Amino acid sequence: MAAVKSAAGARDYRASRRRRAGLTFTFLAVALCVVMVLSAGLGQYNIPINQVVASVGRRLGLAPENPTMQLADSTLWNIRFPRVLLGVLVGAALGTSGAVMQSVFGNPLAEPGVIGVSSGAAVGACLSIVLNLQFFGIFTTPAFAFVGALAATALVYFLSRSSGRAKVLSMILTGIAVTAVANAIIAFLMFIADTTSRDQIVFWQMGSLNGSTWKAVASVWPVILIGLVACFVMASSLDVLALGERAAQHSGVNVERLRAVSIAATALLTGAAVAYAGIIAFIGLIIPHLLRMILGPSNRVLLPASALGGALLIALSDLGARTLVPFADLPIGIFTALVGGPTFFVLLRRSLGQGGGAS
């Protein structure tokens, strides 16, 4: 009798989890679509929502052309839509990479910056700005930032290896050291830079989607797609890793290879996002942490949910950055920090209150 009740309870629990996951995904997807449409319509030049939808219909050949809407169409397709889509890609990349890092390190407070990817990207961007490099035209700074992110991540991984494997603690400590050196290089570059370059560096480090183009979207989406697919494929293995390294190895998981591929995928995602949007804090920390509290630890559910949640938060932050102050385009990093900082504090206090803090 007890076994029957236990089995029934387990079925009810799984059904409850599935319902919660379904509701969460539905909410995130609908909210993201609504915010994307609002973000496309709102700004210094407001475009009614029905005209935004009609413009998409005209582009798809589902609605007749309207000569009186040429200005609105030009604004939407040359400025608003590229920015909105780039923001969605950046948010999805940061949210997913944060969830992967928290799984790899077994710490819900981990984020992509732990492995030095953000600081490496900042060094690359600062070099291109200070030296006024123009090898790839408008893509020079993003290219240098992306290469810097990958280089810093590779440096952290290989320096932390010992006896053929990289331990979690070694990677964290090596990441701290590499980040410190990167910050020193950034400070030196800002010291020798002229006023214009210094202002560009400061604005880039705050994070912004200003100046987004279809070329930027076209160049970044394949990289982010590859990173997302790699992370989603690894989700089941990351769930096994949560049981512990020894248990994962006994289950047939190559822990060292899983960790290396996870870090490489995270470097791709974060490097691509930071290259075009600058450093945007807290997305990779707060979104996975909140969704884990709602959905549980299963990465098969958590990773795609983190992608949607990250995209939603970036879209909301960019909307606020463009509309809260008239005739100004504020850095996105201001809004993510304003949301992420207090949220992080609340989560930390809740964790300590439940006995999760170190004594």
Each predicted region: which residue ranges?
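Alpha-helical transmembrane segments in inner-membrane proteins
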Residues: 2-359
